[in-house]
Amino acid sequence: MMLSDNDIIKEIDSGGLVIEPFNKEFVGPCSYDITLGDEFIVYTDEVYDLKKELNHNKFKIENSIMVCPLCYELDDEKIEYFKNKYGVDVVVKGGLLGTTTEFVELPNDICAQYQGRSSFGRVFLQSHQTAGWIDAGFKGKITLEIVAYDKPVILYKNQRIGQLIFSKTLTPANIGYCDRKGSKYGGQNSVNASLIHKDEI
């Protein structure tokens, strides 16, 4: 059962569902808008070897970041040009990981799905790739997988970037995500790189 605006507010008021910070104006008919945080990760490896821990740079922004498509020609001169002209803190090319401002805590009978806002889709900016599902019992900030496909896009800290859609399960999960053995991302309060190298093969 998908939660409506009334259901979301009731769950927040009862303490079953936690969104911190919570803004009542971000509640949609059956969704909740979440915002872009200030922490990001860019991978530095030549190849993604998924049996090994991936090298990466983690950084914060004060205000804004420019995301350029992978095929975009970008050198130091162009980066400085963009910074000076548009006042962005950082210019990156290719995919990067971001995080939400909000810390979300789901009870064992509510799961969620992340969707990018349609306004971003209309400028060919995708904020998640395959990781839109959030299991019941999860708590933490939501990691975003951000890619620009057409022109460079400027993103701003605290900008509404996506939405969470909540569903109620028929019965509570016996073991929620954060209590499940082998869960990798429970309780995360920051952007985290892939931990797929910890999988048993």
Curated annotation (Swiss-Prot):
DCTP binds at residues 117-122, 135, 143-145, 163, 177, 188. GO terms for molecular function: dCTP deaminase (dUMP-forming) activity; dCTP deaminase activity; nucleotide binding. Its EC number is 3.5.4.30. Keywords: Hydrolase, Nucleotide metabolism, Nucleotide-binding. The record marks 132-133 as: Important for bifunctional activity. It catalyses: dCTP + 2 H2O = dUMP + NH4(+) + diphosphate. One of its GO terms (biological process) is dUMP biosynthetic process. It is an enzyme of class 3 (hydrolase). CDD domains: trimeric_dUTPase. It comes from the Archaea. The keyword Hydrolase applies. Pathway: Pyrimidine metabolism; dUMP biosynthesis; dUMP from dCTP: step 1/1. The active site is at 145 (proton donor/acceptor). Belongs to the dCTP deaminase family. NCBIfam families: dCTP_deam. Bifunctional enzyme that catalyzes both the deamination of dCTP to dUTP and the hydrolysis of dUTP to dUMP without releasing the toxic dUTP intermediate. Homotrimer. PANTHER family: DCTP DEAMINASE. This is dCTP deaminase, dUMP-forming.
